[in-house]
């Protein structure tokens, strides 16, 4: 929409990307939430049916766009794929293999160095993800037999006031509710937790990785901080390599990496990122 402009659907409803003060989010998000979740005195039926109508209008506008907009449309699509706001899947094996080679399939990768991927799911927490801020710091030291001793620090801040989310409310939107988060931390297979602070974790395996997982709640205007210490079987000799994979569909959280006394400048994780420290 930033390329094509405002979208108008049948019935005259208009959608834009301009920020709305009520949620500090694009107008299109606010209007879709209002359509789906605002209490009314009648049965709405298919409360998410507007999405199909909107997508049809968006596709019509894209296919009929002047040629001068095609480069911008293509660039926006590629950027969305790189940043995992769009993920592709094909039933045809050759097509699927092709998109996996360019990292457009959202796969958890095999990697010959250290690895980290944090994946989270909001369970009945309204639209808390619009407002929750997250910062990740990882400190790495060389352990016994050139393996790794690691500390992972994850901080959350939720600066917005809580909305009225009662099912009996007369009006208004429930956007800022209690953030109920299931977190899964993917690390190299064989990693083991040695200490935690602020969170209790279970340990399992999935997709060729060891996974630390837990469930927690964060209330509006609140903050949380977790510290997880663990060992990794990855060996280091001459250099330390780390692949951080971004979760699809989320904004780039801030990351800070320190390894063997060397620091990498903090950065937003907008896409998968490989970091290499020469030792």
For each predicted feature, which ranges?
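Lumenal/extracellular ectodomains and adaptor appendage modules
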Residues: 2-279
């Amino acid at each position: 929409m930033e390329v094509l402009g405002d979208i108008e659907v049948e019935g005259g409803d208009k959608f834009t990307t301009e920020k709305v003060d009520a949620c500090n989010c694009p107008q299109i998000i606010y209007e879709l939430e209002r359509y789906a979740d605002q209490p009314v005195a009648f049965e709405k039926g298919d409360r998410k049916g507007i999405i199909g109508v909107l997508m049809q209008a968006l596709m019509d506008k894209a296919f009929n766009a002047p040629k001068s907009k095609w480069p911008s449309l293509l660039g926006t699509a590629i950027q969305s794929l790189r940043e995992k706001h769009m993920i592709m899947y094909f039933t045809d094996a050759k097509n699927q293999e092709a998109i996996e080679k360019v990292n457009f399939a959202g796969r958890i990768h095999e990697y010959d160095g250290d690895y980290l991927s944090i994946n989270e799911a909001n369970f009945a927490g309204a639209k808390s993800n619009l407002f929750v801020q997250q910062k990740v710091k990882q400190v790495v030291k060389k352990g016994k037999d050139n393996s790794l001793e690691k500390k992972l620090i994850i901080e959350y801040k939720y600066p917005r006031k809580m909305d009225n989310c009662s099912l009996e409310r007369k009006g208004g939107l429930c956007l800022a509710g209690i953030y109920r988060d299931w977190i899964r931390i993917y690390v190299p297979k064989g990693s083991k937790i040695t200490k935690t602070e602020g969170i209790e974790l279970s340990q399992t395996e999935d997709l060729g990785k060891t996974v630390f997982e837990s469930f927690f709640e964060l209330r509006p205007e609140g903050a949380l901080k977790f510290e997880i210490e663990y060992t990794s079987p990855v060996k280091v000799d001459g250099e330390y390599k780390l692949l951080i994979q971004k979760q699809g569909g989320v904004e780039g959280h801030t990351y800070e990496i320190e390894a063997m006394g060397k620091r990498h400048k903090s950065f937003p994780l907008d896409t998968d990122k490989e970091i290499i420290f020469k030792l």
